[in-house]
C-alpha cells in the first residue's frame, strides 16, 4: 500500500522571528513536492507567528503539550493553547523529552490520549538507545513504547490522526544514521506489531517516519524503503536542505 509522504520538521529550541521570515520565504519560492504532507514543529513562543507566516499547505506543530487542559503546571503548554494559536499538530515523546526530561512511557501515553481527545493530530516518537540496540533490545523497547501509545488512542478512527516517528536515539544529532535496511527492519516490525495488537487495516494506513539524522544526502535512499513513509527532521529542517528532503520521492 502506498502511503502519502509525510515530512516533519522539529526545530527543537532553535529559531527566531527573523529565521521564520527567511525560512518560510525560501520555502514559499521553492519547487516542493505537492504530494507531500509537511508539518514543522517550532518552539511554543513562535507557534502563532509561524502559523501566520507558513506558506499555504504547510502545517505548524507544537513540540510538546501536557496531559491536562489547564492548572498549576508552570512552564507547560496545553492543547487548547496550541489550538488557540491555530495549530493542529503536536510532537510527543521525542527522545529528548524521554531522556533529558525523564518522561515515562505512561506519561507520554497520557499526553497522546489528551491531545487526541482535544482534537489535535499527534506525532508520537519511539526509539532505542545505543546500549539497548547493542543489547538486542530494540524491538522490546519500541514495543513497550508503542503499547503505551496504542492503548491511549481512544478509537480506530482516532488512528487517522496519528503519525508514528521512529528515532534511533543513537543516530540523533550524532551524524550517525541507520542504514536504509536498518530503518526498514524496525519500521516493518513496528508495523507488524500494530497489525497484531491494533488492527490490520490501521497497520496498512498508519505512516511511520524515520527520525535519525535525516539529511539531504540520505533522504532519497531512506525514502525508497517500503515501510518508511517519511521523515521527522531535526537540524536539517532549519536549513534549505529541508527542501531536498521534501522532494525525496521525486
UniProtKB/Swiss-Prot annotation:
Q: Which UniProt keywords apply?
A: Cytoplasm, Gluconeogenesis, Glycolysis, Isomerase
Biological process (GO) annotations held by this record are: gluconeogenesis; glyceraldehyde-3-phosphate biosynthetic process; glycerol catabolic process; glycolytic process
Catalytic residues (positions): 94, 167
Enzymatic reactions: D-glyceraldehyde 3-phosphate = dihydroxyacetone phosphate
Q: What cellular-component terms does GO give this entry?
A: cytosol
Organism superkingdom: Eukaryota
Q: Mind telling me which InterPro entries this protein's record contains?
A: Aldolase_TIM, TIM_sf, TrioseP_Isoase_bac/euk, Triosephosphate_isomerase, Triosephosphate_isomerase_AS
Record-stated family: Belongs to the triosephosphate isomerase family.
- List, alphabetically, the PANTHER family matched: TRIOSEPHOSPHATE ISOMERASE (PTHR21139:SF2)
**Quaternary structure annotation from Swiss-Prot or TrEMBL:** Homodimer.
| Protein name stated in the entry | Triosephosphate isomerase
Native organism taxonomy? Eukaryota, Metazoa, Spiralia, Lophotrochozoa, Platyhelminthes
Amino acid at each position: 500500500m502506498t502511503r502519502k509522504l509525510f515530512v516533519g520538521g522539529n526545530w527543537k529550541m532553535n529559531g527566531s522571528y527573523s529565521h521564520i521570515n527567511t525560512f518560510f520565504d525560501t520555502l514559499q519560492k521553492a519547487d516542493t513536492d505537492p504530494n507531500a504532507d509537511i508539518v514543522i514543529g517550532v518552539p511554543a513562543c513562535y507557534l502563532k507567528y509561524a502559523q501566520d507566516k507558513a506558506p499555504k499547505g504547510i502545517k505548524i506543530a507544537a513540540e510538546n503539550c501536557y496531559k491536562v487542559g489547564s492548572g498549576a503546571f508552570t512552564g507547560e503548554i496545553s492543547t487548547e493553547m496550541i489550538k488557540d494559536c491555530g495549530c493542529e499538530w503536536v510532537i510527543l515523546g521525542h527522545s529528548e523529552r524521554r531522556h533529558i526530561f525523564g518522561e515515562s512511557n505512561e506519561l507520554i501515553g497520557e499526553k497522546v490520549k489528551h491531545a487526541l481527545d482535544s482534537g489535535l493530530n499527534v506525532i508520537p516518537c519511539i526509539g532505542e538507545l545505543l546500549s539497548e540496540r547493542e543489547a538486542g533490545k530494540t524491538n522490546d523497547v519500541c514495543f513497550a513504547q508503542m503499547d503505551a501509545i496504542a492503548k491511549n488512542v481512544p478509537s480506530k478512527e482516532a488512528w487517522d490522526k496519528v503519525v508514528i516517528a521512529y528515532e534511533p536515539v543513537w543516530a540523533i544529532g550524532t551524524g550517525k544514521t541507520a542504514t536504509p535496511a536498518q530503518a526498514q527492519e524496525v519500521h516493518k516490525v513496528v508495523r507488524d506489531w500494530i497489525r497484531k495488537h491494533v488492527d490490520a487495516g490501521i497497520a496498512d494506513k498508519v505512516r511511520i517516519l524515520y527520525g535519525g539524522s535525516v539529511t539531504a544526502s540520505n533522504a532519497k535512499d531512506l525514502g525508497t524503503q517500503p515501510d518508511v513513509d517519511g521523515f521527522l527532521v531535526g537540524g536539517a529542517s532549519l536549513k534549505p536542505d529541508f527542501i531536498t528532503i521534501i522532494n525525496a520521492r521525486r
